[in-house]
Amino acid sequence: MARAAFIVCLLMACAWSSHAVMFKLSPNTQKCLKEDIQANQLVMGEFEVSDVPGQIIDYIARDTKGHILSQKEHITKGKFSFMSEVYDTYEICFISKVPAHQRGVIQEVSLLTKKGVETKSYEGIGEASKLKPLEVDLKRLEDLSDSIVRDFVLMRKREEEMRDTNEKTNSRVLFFSIFSMCCLLGLATWQVLYLRRYFKAKKLIE
């Protein structure tokens, strides 16, 4: 019973988890944050940057192919959201721009991101469906469990793909090694026969 309660509490904590970071951005530089995200997941975020007169910070969210999913210029504070179409590594970049005639100042950037189950408003769902608080918690846990199962399935799939790739690579390396040894043996045999004919022609051996 205690173990079950611990698992429920752990799932509840995960359900409310989010990713918050704060970093410093030097003048005329950019910093990107990357994360692997499953397909068809909603990603939401909030950002805030310290205001420095004359300095500009832009942000852009994109995938590995360079497709822009969200973008905004001259940011100070705001929100963004985008939907991941495929499983990929997505990045959010903050870009500092300072005029040449101005001495740049380091700015602070804070970012809070949520994805998947974390983006759902279960209070709103509970009110719309007239659910009791316990039923809302159970709904949250159900969605979180489904999300965890999907993560494990994806990890298993990637593990199988990596194992297949390793097996194919090992087979190719073995084939190449055998081919190289055969080539070396063939070359050595040819050299022995050539030298034997050469020495016979010079009458150095019979």
UniProtKB/Swiss-Prot annotation:
Q: Give me the Lumenal side stretches, as residue ranges.
A: 21-172
Q: Which GO terms describe its biological process?
A: dorsal/ventral pattern formation; endoplasmic reticulum to Golgi vesicle-mediated transport; Golgi organization; Golgi vesicle transport; intracellular protein transport; maternal specification of dorsal/ventral axis, oocyte, germ-line encoded
Q: What are the record keywords, sorted?
A: Developmental protein, Membrane, Signal, Transmembrane, Transmembrane helix
Changing I106V does what? Answer: In strain: MEL11, MEL12, ZBMEL82, ZBMEL131, ZBMEL186, ZBMEL191 and ZBMEL229
Q: Name any one Pfam family assigned in the record.
A: EMP24_GP25L
Cytoplasmic topological intervals: 194-206
Q: Which cysteines are joined by disulfide bonds?
A: none
Annotated function: Eca and bai are essential, though not redundant, for dorsoventral patterning of the embryo. Specifically required during early embryogenesis for the activity of maternal tkv, while the zygotic tkv is not affected.
Homology family: Belongs to the EMP24/GP25L family.
Query: Under which name does UniProt file this protein?
Result: Transmembrane emp24 domain-containing protein bai
Q: Which organism is it from?
A: Drosophila melanogaster
